[in-house]
Amino acid sequence: ISTFGNSADFGDLTRVQNQGSSFASRTRGFLAGGNTPSSQYGSTDTDMVFFSSTGDAVDFATLISIKKEAGCFSNAIRGGHNGGGATTIQYITMTPGGDFVDFGDTSVAYEQNMGLASATRGFTGGGNKVPAYSAANNIEYVIIMTTGNSIDFGDLTISGYGGSSGGNATRGLFYNRYVSPAVNNLSLIHI
């Protein structure tokens, strides 16, 4: 991303879908779960692309269970997928591949939660608590290269879901898209 400019066509996914969740290594990008025209409740499919060249995605792996609207995290080796309407956290080793395996559980079932990571820890923040459908302010984390249940980290400055998140080696930002009343708010954590 060294220059400014408009986007260009990279390729196509293996299926028409929305509400999938993404994570990446330095060389590969992944899109897991999401709704398809034949299933509005999610899917188990995961597409993969190589960043180094344009081209269509390939079917790469299978989630343990049907998911949509989940938060993700990754480092250079593992990609994690959590939420999507359940407490299940699952992960994949991005190279060489294989299907997702069980990592542990979050404290409650979330959907539309947000995920981010440092090289060592994966975080989930906010979300819609299922089945109550109430906005969450929870922040939980896992140690990416181990397995186990998530650990309480703290709280977002405001409850919400369906937003965006991003992080680097030292900081993470959560933006809650759906909150009531609507606010202009970012939550900052030191990771």
Where are these regions (language model features)?
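Glycine-centered tight turns/hairpins at beta-strand boundaries that repeat
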Residues: I1, R26-Y41, F51, N75-G85, ...
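A detector of repeated loop/turn-to-beta-strand junctions in beta-rich toroidal repeat architectures
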Residues: S7, Q17, Y41-D45, A57, ...
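A short beta-strand motif characteristic of beta-propeller blades
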Residues: A8-D12, V58-T62, F100-D105, I151-D155
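Beta-propeller and closely related beta-sheet repeat lectin domains
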Residues: N18-S22, K68-C72, E111-G115, Y161-S165
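Conserved blade-register residue in beta-propeller folds
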Residues: M48-F50, Y91, Y141
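Conserved small/polar residues in nucleotide/adenosyl-binding loops
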Residues: I189-I191
